[in-house]
Amino acid sequence: MPKPRNIAAVKQLTALFQESNAAVLTEYRGLSVAQLTQLRTALGPDTTYAVLKNTLTTIAAKEAGVTAFEGQLSGPSAIAFITGDPVEAAKGLRDFAKTNPQLIVKSGMLEGRAISAADVTALADLESREVLLSKVAGVLKATQSKAAALFQAPLSKTVRTVEALREKQAAGAPAEAAPVEAPAAETVDA
């Protein structure tokens, strides 16, 4: 019969899996409590870094419908449950692992799909969501500005031509008249 604290732990882990849009499975062997605290701080408020019991995590993942970590839960495992921007959390893990090589990224899950450790690293190399959105907005604004200039060009050319004619008339020079066409001769059929 399962212990009440294990049942509560499985419920909590299941909720974390369901609330997270991404998760990264790591091995933390050799890291001190102070280093783990430093990692939690580096990951920010939108990421929960939890040291787990593999059996309870396997049960919680099955209950949540997560298959990304099947067969990978062995040894000292911890998962970074990410509810915010996964790029920022992946950068935090990458930067921490550079200074603390004991932290090993095993795999991850992004929006319900399993991703490899290499994919987590590639995710860390992306720019944040806000930066990417601002770049898209900049491209859209530039495109609109170019379109506005394109549509305004014929109008401004016409205005400049009319202004030049006005200045020429004001200077006393007669405006060049358009050539007058002679009326067509009428033919009479007899």
Swiss-Prot record:
Gene3D superfamilies: 3.30.70.1730, 6.10.250.290. It comes from the Bacteria. GO terms for molecular function: large ribosomal subunit rRNA binding; structural constituent of ribosome. The keyword Ribosomal protein applies. Pfam families: Ribosomal_L10. GO terms for cellular component: large ribosomal subunit. One of its GO terms (biological process) is translation. The keyword rRNA-binding applies. Keywords: Ribonucleoprotein, Ribosomal protein, RNA-binding, rRNA-binding. InterPro entries: Ribosomal_uL10, Ribosomal_uL10-like_sf, Ribosomal_uL10_bac, Ribosomal_uL10_bac_type, Ribosomal_uL10_CS_bac. Residues 170-190 are annotated as: Disordered. Belongs to the universal ribosomal protein uL10 family. Forms part of the ribosomal stalk, playing a central role in the interaction of the ribosome with GTP-bound translation factors. NCBIfam families: PRK00099.1-1. Part of the ribosomal stalk of the 50S ribosomal subunit. The N-terminus interacts with L11 and the large rRNA to form the base of the stalk. The C-terminus forms an elongated spine to which L12 dimers bind in a sequential fashion forming a multimeric L10(L12)X complex. This is Large ribosomal subunit protein uL10. The lineage of its organism: Bacteria, Bacillati, Actinomycetota, Actinomycetes, Kineosporiales.
